[in-house]
């Protein structure tokens, strides 16, 4: 493998994540806060949020010490993904075009992994409640408060979407944006009970 290119990719990924946090601080704050109690949000944070950024940053800043383990893990993942039994081909053409394609597909399939799969283990995601803050170069601060209303015995109904509009464009806008001088505010409630307020 090309170690220099791998380090460049990590640096580029780190930079892109930093930029996305600056441009989407409200959703970043909401996702991170939801990850304290929601396994689904924790997975999303670990694969595309602050949790993911922390892993990428650690790998990029300590590349020399971590590169062997990273390369071994990437190879293991590649063996699990790029397999003959995972290959699905969708092809549209006349019957005449199929024969040359079958030959090309066979060549591709021959390059894929066929060794026995490792036994699958269930993925357990453990949420940890935290009270944390993150510093960026932005002069805008984002604050999020999240929770699960179904866990508190409140069912999801369409009325929550009306509440979202009222909160976001009336109450929160007037009290947080206009009176308080905040940059903006938003709220959301979904069908699995997750709700958040962000300013």
Residue ranges with predicted function:
Residues 1, 105-109, 163:
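Short amphipathic C-terminal alpha-helix that caps PH/PH-like domains
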Residues 44, 49, 71-105:
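Non-catalytic, conformational "gating/processing" segments within enzyme and secreted inhibitor domains
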Residues 66-70, 113, 121-126, 162-166, ...:
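A short linear-motif detector with a strong N-terminal bias
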């Amino acid at each position: 493998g090309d170690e220099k290119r791998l380090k460049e990719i990590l640096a580029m990924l780190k930079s892109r994540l930093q930029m996305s946090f600056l441009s989407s601080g409200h959703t970043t704050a909401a996702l991170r806060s939801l990850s304290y109690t929601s396994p689904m949000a924790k997975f999303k944070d670990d694969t595309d949020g602050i949790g993911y950024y922390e892993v990428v940053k650690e790998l990029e800043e300590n590349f020399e010490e971590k590169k062997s383990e990273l390369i071994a893990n990437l190879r293991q993942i590649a063996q699990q993904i790029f397999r003959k039994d995972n290959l699905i081909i969708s092809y549209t053409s006349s019957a005449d075009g199929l024969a040359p394609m079958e030959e090309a597909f066979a060549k591709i399939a021959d390059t894929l992994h066929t060794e026995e799969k490792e036994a699958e283990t269930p993925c357990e995601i453990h949420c940890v409640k935290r009270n944390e803050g993150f510093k960026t170069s932005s002069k805008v601060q984002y604050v999020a408060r999240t929770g699960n209303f179904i866990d508190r015995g409140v069912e999801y109904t369409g009325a929550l979407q009306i509440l979202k509009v009222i909160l976001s464009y009336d109450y929160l806008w007037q009290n947080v944006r206009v009176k308080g001088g905040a940059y903006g505010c938003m709220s959301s409630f979904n069908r699995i009970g997750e709700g958040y307020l962000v300013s």
